[in-house]
Amino acid sequence: MTQEILEDVNPTRMELLKLQDRIELAKKGHKLLKEKRDALIMEFFEMVKRASEIREQAVKKLMEAYSKLAAAKVTVGEIGVERASMATGEEIKVDVGSRNVMGVVVPIIERVSEDGGSKVVYGFADTSGALDEAMRAFTEAIDAVLELAEIEETLRLMAEEIERTKRRVNALEHIVIPRLENTEKYIEMKLDEQERENFVRLKRVKDLIERKKLKEELERVVEEGAELPSFE
């Protein structure tokens, strides 16, 4: 056979049964992986839409924050903004968790405050309302950027999983299953050959036995002096 088959295969009935089980299992696995691949692709494109919306929101919030910062600088001056910024002593802290999306572990990214809250409220008693508005706007912008980072990392991980699943589907479809099926045909061919050879061998043995019986019968007839049958 010119097709590729499994190495060191033993053409027996037992091996054929085992191979047929492997083919059935491989086909089931191929079907499940195709379903997983298709579901991942659908989920991926849904997330692409969401990522586009979140990206627009993040850009919008950043622009608003910088606009309000510019307004605050006009009100209290650049030095006043810097002093207020240093006075807060606030650091951005991020909590990174995880969740499962279609079998893919993806991150959950959240900004947290010292007391574990999910929001940090900026307030300055001796500063202008414009500066407070700028700080709140930057807080919202940071949240939007973190959300964008979360979904973009999720997209990256899902894209990798889609590629891995595609490779496994292609390997099963174009290499593993054809090789198993070619091996199945090879074993069936060998078993057919063995059956034909056994049939010929048995026929020869039968002919030999019949000839031996005929010879023994002729010898017995001769020894007994019996008359040989006439064929005239």
Curated annotation (Swiss-Prot):
<dbReference type="GO" id="GO:0046933">
    <property type="term" value="F:proton-transporting ATP synthase activity, rotational mechanism"/>
</dbReference>
<comment type="function">
    <text>Component of the A-type ATP synthase that produces ATP from ADP in the presence of a proton gradient across the membrane.</text>
</comment>
<keyword id="KW-0375">Hydrogen ion transport</keyword>
<comment type="subunit">
    <text>Has multiple subunits with at least A(3), B(3), C, D, E, F, H, I and proteolipid K(x).</text>
</comment>
<keyword id="KW-0813">Transport</keyword>
<keyword id="KW-0472">Membrane</keyword>
<dbReference type="GO" id="GO:0046961">
    <property type="term" value="F:proton-transporting ATPase activity, rotational mechanism"/>
</dbReference>
<dbReference type="GO" id="GO:0005524">
    <property type="term" value="F:ATP binding"/>
</dbReference>
<dbReference type="InterPro" id="IPR002699">
    <property type="entry name" value="V_ATPase_D"/>
</dbReference>
<comment type="similarity">
    <text>Belongs to the V-ATPase D subunit family.</text>
</comment>
<keyword id="KW-1003">Cell membrane</keyword>
<dbReference type="Pfam" id="PF01813">
    <property type="entry name" value="ATP-synt_D"/>
</dbReference>
<keyword id="KW-0406">Ion transport</keyword>
<dbReference type="GO" id="GO:0042777">
    <property type="term" value="P:proton motive force-driven plasma membrane ATP synthesis"/>
</dbReference>
<protein>
    <recommendedName>
        <fullName>A-type ATP synthase subunit D</fullName>
    </recommendedName>
</protein>
<dbReference type="GO" id="GO:0005886">
    <property type="term" value="C:plasma membrane"/>
</dbReference>
<keyword id="KW-0066">ATP synthesis</keyword>
